[in-house]
């Protein structure tokens, strides 16, 4: 069984995330959407909200499982018997950052990182941008799924 973990804070879930997830579904038997938790990090949305965003968006997709985890992503992958870490790349900066992490993860665990390029109309979307636009009262609706818009 080909199983991948797509880790993130999903604060909030964006159409950039769903673009990567939806395009990865045919590649894997199961994709675990893994919300990493860090008690020293401030989040805009509660863990419960972020779980709801993911579960509601993928409630009809049998290949998707939603979990939370603490600690190293590779340790979580091992606990789930996942052989791959799925990551999205928006630009060259993402590539350099993710390449370094991916190589380190592989050295530590033998777990490969699989990178998908963002679709051309989604490369500008990030949770950071969405949070900033929301904070300043701007229109963010074109960057997030319906479940986030309703929150």
From Swiss-Prot:
Its principal location? cytoplasm
A Gene Ontology cellular component where this protein is annotated is: cytoplasm
Question: PANTHER family, from UniProt?
Answer: PHOSPHOPANTETHEINE ADENYLYLTRANSFERASE
Which cofactor does the UniProt annotation name? Mg(2+)
EC top class named in words: transferase
Q: Which family does it belong to?
A: Belongs to the bacterial CoaD family.
Query: What residues does the record give for site: Transition state stabilizer?
Result: 17
Q: Which InterPro entries match?
A: Cyt_trans-like (IPR004821), PPAT (IPR001980), Rossmann-like_a/b/a_fold (IPR014729)
Which pathway does the database say it acts in? Cofactor biosynthesis; coenzyme A biosynthesis; CoA from (R)-pantothenate: step 4/5
Binding of ATP occurs at 9-10, 17, 88-90, 98, 122-128
- Function in brief: Reversibly transfers an adenylyl group from ATP to 4'-phosphopantetheine, yielding dephospho-CoA (dPCoA) and pyrophosphate.
Q: Which processes are annotated in GO (biological process)?
A: coenzyme A biosynthetic process
Q: What does the record give under GO molecular function?
A: ATP binding; pantetheine-phosphate adenylyltransferase activity
Q: Give me the residues that bind substrate, please.
A: 9, 41, 73, 87
List the catalytic activities from the record. (R)-4'-phosphopantetheine + ATP + H(+) = 3'-dephospho-CoA + diphosphate
Q: Does the keyword Ion transport apply?
A: no
**Keywords, in A-Z order:** ATP-binding, Coenzyme A biosynthesis, Cytoplasm, Magnesium, Nucleotide-binding, Nucleotidyltransferase, Transferase
Which HAMAP family does this one have? PPAT_bact
Q: What is this protein's name?
A: Phosphopantetheine adenylyltransferase
Q: What is its EC number?
A: 2.7.7.3
Q: Which organism is it from?
A: Christiangramia forsetii (strain DSM 17595 / CGMCC 1.15422 / KT0803)
Localization per Swiss-Prot or TrEMBL: Cytoplasm
* Keyword flag Ribonucleoprotein: no
Q: How does it assemble?
A: Homohexamer.
